[in-house]
Amino acid sequence: MDMNELARRVKEASIVLASAGTELKNRALAQIARSLQDGREEIIRANREDLLRSEKENLPGPLLKRLKFDEAKIQEVIEGIHSLIELEDPVGRTLLSTELDDGLELYKVTCPIGVIGVIFESRPDALVQISTLCLKSGNGVLLKGGSEARETNRVLAAIIAGATHKAGLPPDWIALLETRSDVGEMLKMDKYIDLIIPRGSNEFVRYIMDNSRIPVLGHADGICHLYVDEDADIQMAVKIAVDAKTQYVAVCNAVETLLVHEKIAPAFLPELKKAMDARQVELIGCPRTRAVIPAAPATEEDWRTEYLDLKLSVKVVAGLDEAIGHINTYGSGHTDGIITRSGEKAARFMDYVDSGNVFWNCSTRFSDGFRYGFGAEVGISTSKVHARGPVGLDGLVIYKYRLIGNGHIVGDYAGRLKTFKHRKMNKDYGIVTK
């Protein structure tokens, strides 16, 4: 089918989906979970084909690991769907209600964005997570997965479309794109697609951001920092730094640079070195760091590097303000934390660091939609427009203003026959239809 026609159908179906009630959407999600359960053998067979072909094509080990979609992964996404059903519907919430004048009421009410274009690499579980989040939030979705997962993605998209159709929704709300050229076309389709969400490597996300006509929600880099203040608990700081770096290194919320106050450096750095050596972490330090512990020499480029590996840059700083300046200069606006006993310093850090997630005395690895209680996430945004940080259901809705009157005209107010009252109401939007 022509791609424009495919996108047009998704757009049309998204309008129907946007008006679907919570009960219908949850029924469709439950049907998806049942259909995934029933289709386990077909899914695993398709995934085995993808794995065998990708091994022959010498796909790197980390990508092969992400590509694998076995019994455990299927069960995981099914459990995720059941958790999603339990979450509050983000659509139809009244954010503001104002009586402009007698009988003239204004409501600001959440609504779906429209059609989401999602471009992702390797992970078939991302297809299920993102499409079900789009369904719950009332959005149509155009999906472009990596060619390495094409058989698995075909089966999953067909199962999801069939399940939602069975539940009473139009199947065209979801569509799968398969060819590489589809990505370029997709990025030009601002007539049909309202938001692009890329999931993949830094280079991949940067390419999408640089070549899209459509707003992009995501992040290209995850250069996360921890700052160890002069009055930090040393054992706490070591424990947090180890977790933030090594709990899972190949993720965007792993710490890449550690900033250390000069007064605590002589006591803290040897303890850090001992703990990181035990986990095979290579330390890369500034001259002041290397005066205290052995470390590879850091260059200017190291402060801008997302390693996604067992490497950690370390810099000794004069104090809190230098740490904040460093983070705002070299950071990516993702997640940054401070370790200190001082509430005053923590507050200053959280106010002045220009990032979507700012933490006090805890690991950067907590920056995650599931850990925040969002159920799941479509990604993490470092943007300051619309959504920021881990993006769950709330990040997939926008709002519309609904004004209800009874023959009101602007001429009466322009001519001063009437004046506005602008009274705040504690009232949810609703129209009696019977």
From Swiss-Prot:
GO MF assignments: glutamate-5-semialdehyde dehydrogenase activity; NADP binding
Name this protein carries in UniProt: Gamma-glutamyl phosphate reductase
Family: Belongs to the gamma-glutamyl phosphate reductase family.
Main location as per UniProt: cytoplasm
EC nos: 1.2.1.41
Keyword Phosphoprotein attributed: no
NCBIfam families the record matches: PRK00197.1 (NF001221), proA (TIGR00407)
Pathway in which this enzyme or protein is active: Amino-acid biosynthesis; L-proline biosynthesis; L-glutamate 5-semialdehyde from L-glutamate: step 2/2
Reaction(s) catalysed by this chain's protein: L-glutamate 5-semialdehyde + phosphate + NADP(+) = L-glutamyl 5-phosphate + NADPH + H(+)
Keyword set, alphabetical order: Amino-acid biosynthesis, Cytoplasm, NADP, Oxidoreductase, Proline biosynthesis
Domain of life of the organism encoding this protein: Bacteria
A cellular-component GO term for this protein: cytoplasm
Residue ranges that the Swiss-Prot or TrEMBL entry lists as coiled coil: none
PANTHER family: DELTA-1-PYRROLINE-5-CARBOXYLATE SYNTHASE, GLUTAMATE SEMIALDEHYDE DEHYDROGENASE
Keyword field contains Oxidoreductase: yes
Class of enzymatic activity (EC top level): oxidoreductase
Function field: Catalyzes the NADPH-dependent reduction of L-glutamate 5-phosphate into L-glutamate 5-semialdehyde and phosphate. The product spontaneously undergoes cyclization to form 1-pyrroline-5-carboxylate.
Subcellular location, record wording: Cytoplasm
